[in-house]
Design a protein with these regions (language model features):
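Alpha/beta-hydrolase fold nucleophile elbow
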Residues: 22-34
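Alpha/beta-hydrolase fold catalytic core
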Residues: 183-217, 222-226, 232-238
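Alpha/beta-hydrolase active-site loop
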Residues: 1-20, 78-79
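Short glycine-enriched nucleophile-adjacent loop
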Residues: 38-50
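Active-site rim elements
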Residues: 1-2, 63-68, 128, 137-138, ...
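C-terminal, loop-rich substrate-recognition/catalytic regions characterized by aromatic stacking residues
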Residues: 146-193, 240, 278-282, 286-288, ...
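Mobile gating loops/cap/lid regions near enzyme active sites that modulate substrate access
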Residues: 216-343
Length: 343
């Protein structure tokens, strides 16, 4: 089980054993990922076999609802096998004989049903309860059982907007949100929807869906990890005018434009054609400098306070980068206690 996690651990061991040949320090490796990759990074924090294989971690927009317990994982596996045409007695045989195209088609169908057939987790992700991943990663962080390395975690201001145009996997419409909340306590439903003024107006639904998919994970990870290790939280608000005009804004994955210096490319020049190039490059330089500094020292800048439960400082990347304290507190607290597994 959890074969992708085993692959990641093997890759990190290779890095440890070989990074010196490239001038690197095996004792100072930083891992970082975005979206499902950020979730993988957070999960590795709770993998005992990854002990000592990395010194810092960065989670950009970690996805929520991907971790399954054994019972939920079994339900998802049964559905997957059924889509492949397996019966009660030949699941393993059917799986081994399936063509790659059949596996992809079955997985696509399973993912498409995720919003209507919530089983306690989305259909892709790790399963806890074995020697590789003994417990839910956030639970391990809360208990102090995860790796106590410095962590950066954060989200983007308009996470959900991407999923109204592409990859329509998130609950960003009223019917999808009501299905999501249908198994929750009625008070929880009222509390969550009230945190998004104007619900069920479209913009409120999109903000709610984005928080469910990414905000909840970032908040939970930050709160759990900061009790035992240095934790820094950010929100990425910057978007050039072209992205605002398109209706996407600072949506999911747009921070990668800054991380990977895309604004210096032809594509980046097109995105910043509306007199935004200087601000885009400024934001990029700032973010990259902080990521580099963190990767070297575990500290992303003296002006970025460590996250605490009492003050909850968040560094906001924008035309004017600044620190805000517990932004969107009403949205954060509205989701407390809610999870797919508890529905």
């Amino acid at each position: 089980s959890n074969l992708f996690l085993r692959d990641l651990v093997m890759a990190l061991r290779w890095v440890r054993d070989n990074i010196g040949a490239f001038g690197g320090d095996p004792a100072n490796v930083t891992i970082f990922g975005e979206s499902a990759g950020a979730h993988a990074v957070a999960t590795l924090l709770a993998v005992p076999a990854a002990e000592g294989l990395f010194a810092q971690a960065i989670c950009e927009s970690p996805a929520s609802g991907l971790v399954s317990g054994p019972e939920t994982a079994a339900k998802i596996a049964d559905k997957f096998a059924t889509l492949l045409g397996a019966g009660a007695d030949n699941g393993a045989e059917t799986l081994m004989q399936a063509r790659p195209r059949d596996l992809v088609d079955a997985l696509d169908t399973l993912l498409a049903r995720s919003l209507t057939e919530m089983d306690g987790a989305f259909s892709l992700g790790p399963t806890y309860g074995d020697e590789l991943l003994p417990e839910d990663p956030v639970a391990a962080m809360r208990a102090g059982a995860a790796h106590k390395v410095p962590l950066i975690v954060g989200t983007n201001a308009d996470e959900g907007r991407l999923f109204t145009r592409f990859m329509k996997l998130l609950p960003t419409t009223e019917p999808a949100i009501e299905r999501l909340l249908s198994g929750a306590d009625p008070q929880a439903r009222e509390r969550i929807t009230a945190a998004y003024p104007g619900y069920p107006r479209a913009d409120a639904c999109v903000a709610l869906g984005g928080d469910f998919a990414f905000g909840t994970a970032a908040w939970q990870i930050a709160e759990a990890h900061t009790a035992h290790a240095p934790t820094y939280v950010y929100r990425y608000d910057y978007a050039p005018r072209t992205l605002h005009w398109s209706g996407l804004g600072a949506t999911h994955a747009t921070e990668l434009l800054a991380v990977f210096d895309i604004y210096r490319t032809r594509f980046g020049s097109a995105l910043t054609a509306a007199m935004d190039r200087r601000s885009a490059l400024t934001v990029s330089r700032d973010l990259q400098a902080r990521w580099r500094g963190f990767s070297r020292t575990g500290v992303p800048g003296d002006d970025w306070p460590r996250y605490t439960d009492s003050e909850r400082p968040v560094l906001v990347f924008d035309r004017r980068t600044r620190v805000e304290y517990d932004p969107h507190a009403h949205r954060r607290t509205a989701w407390e206690g809610f999870s797919l597994a508890s529905r």
